[in-house]
Amino acid sequence: MKPSRRRRALLAAATILALTGVGAGPAQAEPPPDAPEQIDNGDFSTGIAPWFSYGTGPLGITDGRLCATVPGGLANPWDAGIGQDGVALTAGAEYTLAFEVSASPGTPVTAVLQLGSAPYTGYASVTVTAGGTAQRVERTFTVPDDNPSAQLIFQVGGSADEQTACLDNISLRGGEPPEPYEPDTGPRVRVNQVGYLPGGPKNATVVTEATGPLPWQLRSASGAVLASGSTDPRGVDLASGQNVQSIDFSAYRSPGAGLTLVADGETSHPFDISGTLYDRLRADSLQFFYAQRSGIAIDGELLGPQYARPAGHLGVAPNQGDTDVPCQPGVCDYRLDVRGGWYDAGDHGKYVVNGGIATYQLLNAFERTKTAATADGGTALGDSTLRVPERGNGMPDILDEARWELEFLLRMQVPAGRPLAGMAHHKIHDRNWTGLPLAPQDDPQPRELHPPSTAATLNLAATAAQCARLYAPYDAAFAARCRAAATTAYAAAKANPTRYASPTDSTGGGAYDDSNVTDEFYWAAVELWLTTGAPAYLADLSASPQHTADVFDPSGFGWQGVAALGRLDLATVPNALPAAELARVRASVTAAADEYLTELGRQAYGLPLPGDAGSYVWGGNSNIINNAVVLATAFDLTGDARYRDGAVQAADYLFGRNALNISYVTGWGEHAAQNQHSRIFAHQLDPASPNPPAGSLAGGANAALQDPFAAQLLAGCAPMFCYVDDINSYATNEVAINWNSALAWIASFLADQGEAGAVPRATCAVTYTNHGTWHGGTGFTAQVTLRNTGATVVNGWAVRFAFTGDQKVREAWLAKVTQAGATVTARNESYNARINPGGTVTFGFNATTGGGANPPPGLVTLNGTRCASS
């Protein structure tokens, strides 16, 4: 087990005792006046970040100073501290540490400059007795070692009485000025470093000063020329500022490995052409969620020994959560057990709104397999397809993983009998920010529930409604819990429609504020109607302004804008909308997809995102993927290969066809991101800590540069260059569950496309007739008629479809019918195996249902091929 932060401070203090007379004494010469500053935001003019604390009350800014309340009775100075990570030090260089400090009523404060990871070597320290009046402290010293990621800690514990400690004008001058940053962009021919599907689009981008067409060659691993042609000049690309040309080698369709493109004297990174390119990515992108689990020990035999760790936040010291968590002061008078769920991103917080969209996308990736012709009935997402502890339990593994978060979301609901009962607490996280690295089991911070919000409550309502229909075939009791929680949450949100999370509630965790929840109301109403069929929810969604609005933003949907989630489900999940209304809903999806295709064609790097700076935002890679999700959904709805090809081409950007020539997915591509901002995966800072697991998506280029590291390093960057693979850049290089959920969705779609060949024409038509209910609505009788619309005889048939919820076939006639989960398979009897062209076959069944929505299935296949509805 790694030492806790408290233990690290103790180790550093012990080491510094040996250094005090050597490098930390006052006899050192000061660095020159123009020496570079190594501390970010030392005057707190931009707020609290990147400062963190442990063992104190929340950090706050008072009269321009950074202040915290320190509890009395702490045994040691290092039991509480305020600090900053990522301080760069140069061996042999002289530094001057300066700061102003005060404490009331008064206590010793020790400033410690130390190595930020094992063995936590201390470089210098100075102890002063701080009182009510601020005093200025300076100390000059020499550093013996190079260290790009040292740590400055102000130890403020050890007093018998409660203290208020304040710091200001913190400076560490010295060392070498950073060299101008020049990213290593590799060869000027930019390709999808993973590769291309044989029948899919194959495009690359060449960065060049040439303005006329250039010859290109596709070469095998041995150097043989496989194809050739001329580039298409595109001029200066807005997003990158580069003069670029395009290569289209889509006509080459043969599989191969280790291929390269050569143009303008440059050879690309190698790539493959294969119909199985993305099969492993489907699993890798989902494995990320197991690695992010809270409240369970991570099994190294499942994920790899480097990722094994004890359970975090199960009430075992030094953890102070999550089995008995209080609210922030003044918020509530109860405590909740909110164990489990996923750690949200690079921190140890858990947030309902971000957990909501992430859970939705995993559940939707599974639900898509019921209606998408290329999904093969969801076999690739079934039981034992992931390395999770629950594998082999009879439930699809993707549902096992989503359930880990759903159980947490349910625990965040305010209990009955309490004020705001039925609403959901917005989030739970540490009282103060912590530094990096920090394993979950080593987090010493108090944990707090934050006030309930309407947005969080509606996220719970929507995802719990999804849960109620999708888990019903596997765990009826859990599905019933979800349904009850969803209906209760929706009613509570309607009773409290304007409880917004505070945008300033960002100490110790992200604010995730949202003051427009019309989209959340729409999404929740859609999910509840799809699950229950209750007219009240249909009335609410129909009356929502979002129902007829353009909900597909050019820059993509995300946690703060979720109307698109409702629209996509309304378009794809079978339901009882009138035909004209359903056609309008689906047309809105294809219209948005058309716009994304147009944008993709405009962009020289071939992505469905505008090239202006405002479109490159925090987590922007997920926005690009979410636009690809719309394209993919349009393909599922229509079978139009243009939409499939657009979604496939959008993936090229993620895997290296971009200005930086980097794959943003760890472990995928010749040159891939690996130093994402994370307290758990912090190998850059601590060699004993792993890099993020393969399949982890980096946030991506972010023109706003909201972290100090990126702001200093990348100032003036063209939008597509506003990224650095460094753990200190949380604004461009964090991991997050809602980003990986988008990746998991599109990875599953891409894997389903195989070789991306011609879309088969339907050679059958199906009529599904529900003849009505019996036994008080708990049973129904249905009939399925298939017509052979092709030109050849069908000799032996298997028909497959999936129910939306808990429907269960009890008996059938004219076919041999079996059911696994929600999926029904009907096979011919010996006497009706033959269906002549133009001929029909009919079978029927009786089934039970719990009384929710019971629409006809959205997809019926005959021998694996989609049938048209008639």
Residue ranges and their predicted role:
Residues 194-265, 275, 291-356, 360, ...:
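Aromatic (Trp/Tyr) and acidic
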